[in-house]
A protein has these predicted regions:
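Conserved hydrophobic/aromatic pocket- or pore-lining residues that grip, position, or stack substrates
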Residues: 81, 112, 291, 326, ...
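A short helix-breaking turn/cap at a secondary-structure junction
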Residues: 193-282, 305, 461-484
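Glycine/threonine-rich flexible loop motifs
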Residues: 90-101, 277-278, 390-400
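Serine-dependent amide/ester hydrolase catalytic core
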Residues: 14-21, 36, 268, 272, ...
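Gly/Ser-rich catalytic/binding loops embedded in alpha/beta enzyme cores
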Residues: 2-176, 289, 294
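Short glycine/serine-rich loop segments
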Residues: 105-231, 413-426, 433-440
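Short helix-loop capping/hinge segments that flank enzyme active sites or metal/cofactor-binding pockets
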Residues: 4, 73-95, 258-267, 317-371, ...
Length: 484
């Protein structure tokens, strides 16, 4: 049988579709190639439950005789974070004692399958989606696909790793505090955190039900949008569902995206934080230089309303919402929880109803302050994460180091914003030199397509600059840097 190993070097959706149209590849051949890789060792601890060859083949067989052009995701392999339901496959949220086997898929998964996508497995995560490191799982600390000494980021850890390794063209994660963005940044991927409610969270094990979003990992903005378009739709029984309402003119297929004149809010210098990481500080400065070269307008903003909102998420009563999601299970089987998760959720009991209402009042005030900032800008640009860390560093100090990853992400869902993690080249100085660096573009609710257009312009208008996104030192799908 002909080898299709080259697939794993660039698993883009359009490249796959082109091969299907040309007859040089079939979905069944793709499944055979993927099964050969996912059935063996898993040194990155990316998977909780890879699908077997036969399980994947059922989805491939269902595509036989179908029109490729009628199915936007025809034969496209995707991975699913194991807190999202896939019919007939256990959902565990990385807690084996919590496992159940759904009879129907989550609506977002069902829509993707209906569009022709092929699920290939359930991925590892920080237990109950609580964490940004990927290290809080009984299935092993998820390791970075590009350098296994480093953390993958989380909580959608395996979702990012599966795409970075080229096994999946895209994957689904969830994002409450940055879980769909931090792992993307650590792997040079795009991570779309959509507007709350636009992708249904039915069939998703809740973390903070009022804040949870299903997120998308992809190799390109085009791929992320194709998945976003296919997955979107209101589930009638989803109380948190919202119709997608993009601003007028946001989705003009013939328009050429440009950064020229776009007003990017940038936190004041004294509000930027890298926790001593010179690699990330230098990389962000280089990203801002490239935005200026593309004629974007950089507007200094007071970032304090956003930082204060971020502090509410883990220093306020929203931790109690995590407990509410699994209280009955946690009370009955406390020893089934990962020790760090047990510590975090155990602290939720100290928050009273009065504390919660005081926090809601505080959040309303911060939203008002943030709205004033938005009057001057079109989007915010920040590092996606303030720093990165090795697996050993996280094992030594799991809560404090993890919290650093959320400095620029924790505010987004509380303020009802959309966000997109975008690759921004690699670190060129300091101890993280050679590892990917990412920025995040943040916009108002329902401006998801605006963000994707900004990302397209970012790629088109900044790739000629030294150290830019796809220069000779940048990690591409299926590659890794030898940093040893």
């Amino acid at each position: 049988m002909k080898s299709h190993d080259d697939l794993f070097q660039s698993m883009s959706i359009e490249a796959l579709r082109a091969r299907y149209r040309a007859g040089s590849l079939t979905p069944a051949q793709l499944v055979e190639a993927i099964a050969a890789r996912t059935s063996g060792d898993d040194p990155h601890h990316a998977w909780i439950r890879p699908l077997s060859r036969n399980e994947m083949m059922r989805y491939a067989d269902a595509l036989e005789g179908r029109d490729i052009d009628a199915l936007p995701l025809y034969g496209v392999p995707f991975a699913i974070k194991d807190n999202i339901d896939l019919a007939g496959i256990p959902t565990t949220a990385a807690c084996p004692a919590y496992a159940y086997t759904p009879t129907v898929s989550a609506p977002v998964v069902a829509r993707l399958i209906a569009a022709g996508a092929i699920p290939i497995g359930k991925t590892n995560l920080d237990q109950f989606a609580t964490g940004l490191s990927g290290q809080r799982s009984p299935h092993g600390a998820c390791r970075n696909a590009l350098d296994p000494r480093y953390a993958s980021g989380g909580s959608s850890s395996g979702s990012a790793v599966s795409v970075a390794l080229g096994l999946a063209a895209f994957s689904l994660g969830t994002d409450t505090a940055g879980s769909g963005r931090v792992p993307a940044a650590f792997h040079g991927l795009f991570g779309l955190k959509p507007t709350k409610g636009v992708l249904s969270t039915l069939g998703v094990v809740p973390a903070c039900k009022s804040l949870d979003c299903v997120s998308i990992f992809a190799h390109s903005a085009d791929d992320a949008q194709r998945v976003f378009d296919a997955a979107r739709g209101v589930a009638p029984s989803d109380p948190y569902a919202r119709e997608f309402q993009p601003p007028p003119g946001a989705a003009q297929p013939d328009a050429q995206p440009s950064l020229r004149g776009v007003r990017f809010g940038v936190p004041r210098a004294d509000q930027l934080e890298f926790f001593g990481d010179t690699s990330y500080a230098h990389a962000f400065d280089a990203a801002l230089t490239r935005l200026r070269a593309a004629r974007a307008e950089l507007v200094e903003i007071d970032f304090e309303p956003f930082l204060a909102t971020a502090r509410l998420l883990y220093e306020g009563p929203w931790v109690a919402e995590r407990l509410a999601a699994i209280r009955e299970f946690a009370d009955a089987q406390p020893d089934a929880l990962h020790p760090v998760i047990r510590e975090i959720i155990g602290g939720a009991a100290r928050w009273s109803a009065a504390d919660a209402f005081a926090a809601f009042d505080r959040l309303a005030f911060l939203r008002m302050q943030a709205a004033q900032v938005w009057q001057r800008i079109d989007a915010i640009v920040t590092p996606t994460s303030a720093t990165t860390a090795t697996v050993d560093e996280l094992e030594a100090d799991p809560i404090r180091v993890n919290s650093r990853f959320g400095y620029y992400t924790n505010f987004v869902n509380l303020l009802d914003l959309s966000a997109l993690a975008v690759p921004a080249g690699v670190c060129t100085v300091g101890r993280h030199a050679g590892l990917p660096f990412g920025v995040s573009f943040v916009a108002r609710a329902h401006e998801d397509i605006v963000l994707l257009d900004l990302a397209r312009a970012w790629l088109d208008e900044t790739t000629a600059a030294p150290g830019s996104i796809y220069d000779a030192t940048t990690v591409r799908p299926g590659e890794s840097h030898d940093r040893h």
